[in-house]
């Protein structure tokens, strides 16, 4: 799993919404790519998995790829918030607490090969998530 967001706890979406409200602008790295993962969708997949004998190691994220910058832009678009989002390179972003991989995409072929339904598109997941939270 990667780039996880859900109703409980802190996550990138909640952080972006807070920054967007407080500042009206955000600087977000545009050179790291991956796939966001909604905990609700992941939980559905895990329930499906435990009802089988298809054990093993799987990669599971919502479908599609984006950069953190594209993720932030979609969050604000889906939330209907007008925020100026500025793309920056990782080496220009001093606030990073941990080094992140430039490419965290994962192959999810094993899911399909074993008959599991892949998680929905990440943009769809963001839209559904925003309906679930109070912000």
What are the residue ranges of the model-derived segments?
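NAD(P)-dependent short-chain dehydrogenase/reductase
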Residues: 1-34, 40-41
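Conserved C-terminal active-site "lid" loop/helix of NAD(P)H-dependent oxidoreductases
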Residues: 67-73, 90-134
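Tryptophan-centric aromatic hotspots in well-structured domains and transmembrane helices
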Residues: 3, 12, 55, 68-71, ...
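Mid/C-terminal beta-alpha module of Rossmann-like enzyme folds, strongest
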Residues: 45, 52-97, 102
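Hydrophobic "lid"/C-terminal helical patch
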Residues: 16, 46-50, 72-75, 126-130
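Short histidine/acidic/glycine/proline-rich micro-motifs that form metal-
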Residues: 2-6, 33-35, 62-66, 93-94
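Catalytic phosphate/metal-binding cores of nucleic-acid and nucleotide-processing enzymes, i.e., regions
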Residues: 40-47, 51, 56, 130, ...
């Amino acid at each position: 799993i990667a780039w996880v967001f859900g109703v409980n706890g802190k996550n990138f979406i909640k952080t972006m919404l807070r920054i967007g409200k407080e500042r009206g602008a955000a600087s977000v790295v545009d050179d790291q790519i991956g796939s966001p993962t909604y905990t609700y969708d992941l939980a559905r997949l895990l329930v499906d998995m435990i009802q089988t004998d298809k054990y093993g190691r799987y990669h599971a994220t919502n479908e599609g790829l984006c950069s953190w910058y594209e993720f932030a832009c979609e969050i604000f678009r889906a939330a209907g918030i007008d925020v100026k989002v500025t793309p920056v390179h990782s080496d220009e972003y001093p606030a990073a607490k941990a080094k992140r991989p430039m490419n965290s995409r994962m192959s999810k072929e094993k899911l399909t090969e074993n008959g599991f339904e892949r998680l929905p598109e990440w943009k769809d997941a963001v839209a559904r998530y925003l309906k679930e939270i109070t912000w």
